[in-house]
């Protein structure tokens, strides 16, 4: 589970991720949001987000609840809004690259509705996010000369497969890779 924040704008951050991340990150986003909405954090409900088959994501054991990215998402409504927008952007990016809807698309849009209903805030409040969590290797995590966005860019760049993982739309490959 990770978020890979490469830009303060959740849409731009999603657009520059490699194909591999665009495929797997929407599901991880749904899992994190289910925990954030549940009794582990906001206590809005344990079965608010449903999978494509209609069953809710399991929250009883609190998988991922102690992960730095989940904790970050639950730290403020602004962070939660950012993650929701990023998840929706990942879903849109998936459709752009693969020509079909991601299996988590409806759940991510459902998360946006849940957020509006329970927080009474506009989803655009993500603009007030002040920091981001980094979950990655120590060489990037403890480098005080760089910010979290740069740490994620360097982390992604360190993967030998990343530079060639823009097969669906090579124009999405960022200059920093």
Residue ranges and their predicted role:
Residues 1-66, 70-177:
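Sequence termini and other peripheral, non-core segments
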